[in-house]
């Protein structure tokens, strides 16, 4: 139980006479499960139009700001402004929580890093991790409002595509530990340089107090820029991770054993050896930072490292599934130049006689789009793909540069691909599907499954 009548009355400044007991807060009726608290927010659609649907799905209570005709009046919580009510609930949770708050940002790797840290901590502690990649202001408020009072560690990912967004988030979240996974060209459409992206990401440290801790990827672009910003903020408790022996945490060795990988880490002078099911190198590099945080928290990193084997990619983020006779790497949730390079290197690492790449546009790159798409050609060639399907306006630049020896086809959109390629999964192939979410490459998997 996360909310009851007494607490809601106090937080919202209203009187709730009926008995209410509910758990997670939802604003999308599609996500409502039995016992949830539904809040009718006004966005592109009016949440009040979905109150009945939420109740049908088992909502224990609904927060509304205008009258809705429903039979079960005891479930109604009437407020003046639903979004203001949500903010009050989120602030109450943060201000009254005894949890250690950990915030993660970066151009890529936020969600996978957050989920990895959750897996390593949840075996011994009560852990709350923000749901999915819901990392904007609304997402943070909904997640905070859904946090149990006895949470010991709260892990949030924070996203942005404009300056000032993360600063606003941390004023509410007040993280005790903040991590930057990397700085790359994602969202470059909205910035003039990588340095500007770094500055925006460093807003995660804007609300730091004396004892708060910064964790930084030393291999990232703009590392020195980040250190300079931290210095100007008078932040001194800084820990780095990466491939260098000079860092606090180092990935010493990544060895591909076929079905498995052997990893050797050094975390604050402690060496760890672990063999886990095969995952691409870029995931294990992020694990370096995760293990570093575990060590900073004073936990047993040897026990934590043994749980690395329990981490599996989430849907659309490198998950491998079988469709007909093919193994399919589903990495279509999002794409930036760095994550696209990592995905193609992953394809290169996995042994297979026949490899196909389905590449969708990388969005939000602005005037750099043509150049950054063209840079992918060499990575596609290195992956030894026998077939390449290109989807979207910007992948036309790739199509123009790929040699004739590769069987290639270009499509303006994903529906065109689905219509024209009817035998996509009939061969015995390894297929990578990678592109920005806006290209909707997930429709390929949904169509064939």
Curated annotation (Swiss-Prot):
Gene3D superfamilies: Mur ligase, C-terminal domain (3.90.190.20), Mur-like, catalytic domain (3.40.1190.10), MurE/MurF, N-terminal domain (3.40.1390.10). ATP binds at residues 106-112. It comes from the Bacteria. GO terms for biological process: cell division; cell wall organization; peptidoglycan biosynthetic process; regulation of cell shape. Keywords: ATP-binding, Cell cycle, Cell division, Cell shape, Cell wall biogenesis/degradation, Cytoplasm, Ligase, Nucleotide-binding, Peptidoglycan synthesis. GO terms for cellular component: cytoplasm. It catalyses: D-alanyl-D-alanine + UDP-N-acetyl-alpha-D-muramoyl-L-alanyl-gamma-D-glutamyl-meso-2,6-diaminopimelate + ATP = UDP-N-acetyl-alpha-D-muramoyl-L-alanyl-gamma-D-glutamyl-meso-2,6-diaminopimeloyl-D-alanyl-D-alanine + ADP + phosphate + H(+). Its EC number is 6.3.2.10. One of its GO terms (molecular function) is UDP-N-acetylmuramoylalanyl-D-glutamyl-2,6-diaminopimelate-D-alanyl-D-alanine ligase activity. Involved in cell wall formation. Catalyzes the final step in the synthesis of UDP-N-acetylmuramoyl-pentapeptide, the precursor of murein. Belongs to the MurCDEF family. MurF subfamily. This is UDP-N-acetylmuramoyl-tripeptide--D-alanyl-D-alanine ligase. It comes from Rickettsia conorii (strain ATCC VR-613 / Malish 7). The lineage of its organism: Bacteria, Pseudomonadati, Pseudomonadota, Alphaproteobacteria, Rickettsiales.
